[in-house]
Amino acid sequence: AWMVASQSSPEASCGSCWAFSAVEAVESAENVNGNKLVDLSEQKLVDCDPGSYGCDGGFMDTAVKYMIAQKVWPLEKEYAYTARDGSCKTTKGSFTLTVNAYKTPSSTKTLTTILESEGAPSVAVDASDWSSYTSGVHSCRSKDLNHGVQAVGIDDNGNWVIRNSWGTRWG
């Protein structure tokens, strides 16, 4: 299973992986719902999500719930990513969200089903040793979750393919 995704931007020195992961999951779900692929604003979450801490981290589930509650969300070009904490702007945006629910998968099988039918989901991983990763299959056995990414596919060997927010020079 593979999902189409918008181009990922690097989160830079701002700990906003949670915002990228949440926004990318919503973008993917919107695409599965029949909308064209859109590039939604991560910065709106960094600045405005009351359940997270901006560049100091956050939670994908509360971020998606916050987006759903807003009903309309700005595009990246309407509320651009700055890689730093900012004041919450009242920019409402021009994209009406059709996503209206958030699921937390209870198993790998459930996660696979979500990927295949509802879009590329937001997932948390232990990225403690990812700074030295260059390519290939990486085994992640820890339950110390400290980084948000997006599951975008499963390869022929059953390995998850993830989309990271560290830019094109990583991996």
Predicted feature residues:
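Catalytic-core signature of thiol
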Residues: 1-171
